[in-house]
């Protein structure tokens, strides 16, 4: 199927300077869509970000990037003011993508000292059989685990030293509230804002990103997990209440993907190793594969997909 969008069709991507957001911006731009990216990055980071934006500029119908706080009233007003002028000739937002990764990764409970390094005894026995020091073996395993390919890391996962966590602070109510809004319910805020401005296309898509943390408890992920569950609930409500206006809302659950956002999560190396070992294809999901699917959801042929969570993980979630 050949995919071709009109330059009057816009993608508004929240969190579009890296990861899924950037990959999606590049993908839909290559197929002719105009792109608006909202991101928040330090000036020093822009040197690494601009080449990706240049790729989009080279093929998008039109492109604009806003480096500001997408969660503030002022930020939304700036974006909507600019887009209202740009789209005055008839352009409309075909796809609004929520890919904001701004959450608190503190522990919910203190670590139990008795629940520690499950692989320590195995490493000691292996070191003894090999005739090397346990510390030397641990360092070698850690090096291969962190720097080897996905298959090697997956095989060594059970022997690797456990992740380290910041135990100096724990999650508080305000941490939950901020994370749930930034990574969850702010989706509703943006949909309402774009809708009230009359900028949605007659046939539009609202897409957002979730993870298996919506069902599986991961240490240090409690606030983000709560946000993802809220996001999915909000998306279902959008799917029902905005359907009469031609807006379809879905959530994409990507497999474990090596990204800057993932690497911020304590224990991310262990998550990647376990995912690569479990995935039927023996590797991680890529941001580009997820972007390919999101692009498909923007086509006319996907108009009847509404109100669901769609896994894009190569079978990772269902593999035993």
What is the meaning of each model-derived region?
Residues 101-230, 235-244, 256-257:
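Catalytic loop of short-chain dehydrogenase/reductase
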Residues 216, 281, 293-295, 306-320:
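Short C-terminal tail/terminal secondary-structure segment
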Residues 32-50:
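Conserved glycine-rich Rossmann-like NAD(P)H-binding loop of the short-chain dehydrogenase/reductase
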Residues 56-74:
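Rossmann-fold cofactor-recognition segment
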Residues 97, 207, 249-252, 262, ...:
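Hydrophobic structural elements of the Rossmann-like NAD(P)H-binding subdomain
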Residues 248-258, 298, 311-313:
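Conserved SDR Rossmann-fold cofactor-binding beta-strand/turn motif
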Residues 48, 223, 244, 254-279, ...:
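A glycine/serine/threonine-rich, flexible loop-to-helix segment
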């Amino acid at each position: 199927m050949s995919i071709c969008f009109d330059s009057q069709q816009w993608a508004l991507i929240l969190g579009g300077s890296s990861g899924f957001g950037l990959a999606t911006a590049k993908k839909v731009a290559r197929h002719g869509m105009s792109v608006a990216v909202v991101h928040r990055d330090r000036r020093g980071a822009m040197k690494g970000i601009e080449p990706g934006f240049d790729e989009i500029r080279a093929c998008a119908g039109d492109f604009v990037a806003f480096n500001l706080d997408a969660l503030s009233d002022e930020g939304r007003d700036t974006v909507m003011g600019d887009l209202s002028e740009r789209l005055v000739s008839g352009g409309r937002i075909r796809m609004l993508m929520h890919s904001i990764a701004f959450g608190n990764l503190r522990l919910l409970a203190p670590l139990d000292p008795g629940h520690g390094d499950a692989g320590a005894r195995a490493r000691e026995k292996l070191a003894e059989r090999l005739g090397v020091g346990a510390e030397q073996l641990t360092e070698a395993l850690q090096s291969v685990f962190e720097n080897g390919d996905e298959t090697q890391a997956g095989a060594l996962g059970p022997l690797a030293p456990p992740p380290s966590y910041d135990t100096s602070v724990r999650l508080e109510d305000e941490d939950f509230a901020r994370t749930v809004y930034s990574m969850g319910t702010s989706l509703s805020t943006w949909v309402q804002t774009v809708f009230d401005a009359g900028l949605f296309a007659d046939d539009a898509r609202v897409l957002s990103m979730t993870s298996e943390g919506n069902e599986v408890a991961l240490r240090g992920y409690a606030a983000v997990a709560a946000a993802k569950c809220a996001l999915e609930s909000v998306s279902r409500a959008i799917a029902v209440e905005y359907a009469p206006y031609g807006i379809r809302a879905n959530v994409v659950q990507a497999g474990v993907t090596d990204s800057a956002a993932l690497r911020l999560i304590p224990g991310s190396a262990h998550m990647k190793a376990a995912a690569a070992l479990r995935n039927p294809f023996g590797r991680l999901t890529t941001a580009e594969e997820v972007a390919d699917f999101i692009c498909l959801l923007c086509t006319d042929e996907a108009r009847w997909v509404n109100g669901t969570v769609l896994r894009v993980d190569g079978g990772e979630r269902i593999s035993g």
